[in-house]
Amino acid sequence: MFTNAMQLKGWIKNKSKQTGIHPNELLQNFVLERLLERVSLSPYRENIILKGGFLIAAMVGVDKRTTMDMDTTIKGLPVNREEIGKIMVEIVSINIDDGVAFEIQNIKNIHEVSEYDDFRISILALLYKIKVNNKFPRRRAAGY
């Protein structure tokens, strides 16, 4: 992992030259990977199902597909603003000594009227002195 912002910026610059992917997209992807690492270390790793563009990028490679958010479905847990807030605070509080800190900015309903509760969580990632905004849509799985 990186020990300072200069190392991270250098890695992103080199990766951008190699892949042709815009540096901001690479930075966003890096931040989402750091968040996903925390999810995988949390007690909720079996309840949060990754889907969408970030899952595809993980399967086929970032050079084939980039995404600006992490789309998930929740199974086996109550899905309401308060519970989602508690879960996300717990997840982003996991320290894995990677130089990344997360702050929950807000939690909003994605749809006014929907069969299931669904939320968009805006998260600010702090990498040394670099700030990156993220969106983390959460939905309840059908039948749970």
Identify the role of each PLM range.
Residues 1-144:
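Compositionally biased terminal segments of proteins
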